């Protein structure tokens, strides 16, 4: 690993070799080159972060190393915690809402069933009233037909037999209307 101290030592060694007599000049310069090359093997450039040359000798571009800051990491951790809490709260709220909806639906169905029961009882009482009124009307028609038949019998006997058949037909028709009203389901009244 190259430090400024290593650089100084390498320069001194190169300078010392250059001070030797000129006889061995060629021999002395070569070792200095070899020494500097040997030192460069362990030297790392601070610009491109590669071994083999000094920073001032670098011809490459500076490499960007992404080092996330501690504050950014802490912010991410806080956001994750907040998101987890929000998810848990939303899950809890949805569960509560589901329970509330179930309770509402149960209460609505029970109230609707009770209201339908009460409306059914109301309609049945109304149908009973209509059947009693129709039966009273039938009895009125029977009396009128019987009175007409009695007046007809005073005039002629043949007409009285005809009126008796008329009264019997009217009574049979009234019974058929009663039976049909009992078979049909009660009709609901429209509310205004």
Curated annotation (Swiss-Prot):
GO terms for molecular function: nucleic acid binding; zinc ion binding. Keywords: Metal-binding, Zinc, Zinc-finger. InterPro entries: ZCCHC10, Znf_CCHC_sf. SUPFAM superfamilies: Retrovirus zinc finger-like domains (SSF57756). Residues 109-136, 144-179 have a biased composition (Low complexity). Pfam families: zf-CCHC_3 (PF13917). A zinc finger (CCHC-type) spans 43-60. Residues 89-192 are annotated as: Disordered. PANTHER family: ZCCHC10 PROTEIN, ZINC FINGER CCHC DOMAIN-CONTAINING PROTEIN 10. This is Zinc finger CCHC domain-containing protein 10. The gene is ZCCHC10.
């Amino acid at each position: 690993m190259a430090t400024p101290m290593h650089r100084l030592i390498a320069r001194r060694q190169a300078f010392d070799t250059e001070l030797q007599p000129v006889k061995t000049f060629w021999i002395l310069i070569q070792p200095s080159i070899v020494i500097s090359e040997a030192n460069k093997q362990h030297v790392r450039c601070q610009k491109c972060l590669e071994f083999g040359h000094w920073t001032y000798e670098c011809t490459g571009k500076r490499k960007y190393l992404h080092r996330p800051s501690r504050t950014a990491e802490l912010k991410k951790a806080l956001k994750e915690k907040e998101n987890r809490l929000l998810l848990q709260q939303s899950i809890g709220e949805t569960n509560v809402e589901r329970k509330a909806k179930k309770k509402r639906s149960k209460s609505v169905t029970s109230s609707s069933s009770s209201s339908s029961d009460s409306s059914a009882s109301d309609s049945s009482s109304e149908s009973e009233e209509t059947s009693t009124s129709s039966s009273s009307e039938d009895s009125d028609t029977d009396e009128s037909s019987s009175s007409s038949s009695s007046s007809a019998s005073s005039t002629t006997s043949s007409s009285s037999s005809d009126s008796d058949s008329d009264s019997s037909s009217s009574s049979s028709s009234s019974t058929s209307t009663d039976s049909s009203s009992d078979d049909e389901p009660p009709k609901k009244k429209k509310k205004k």
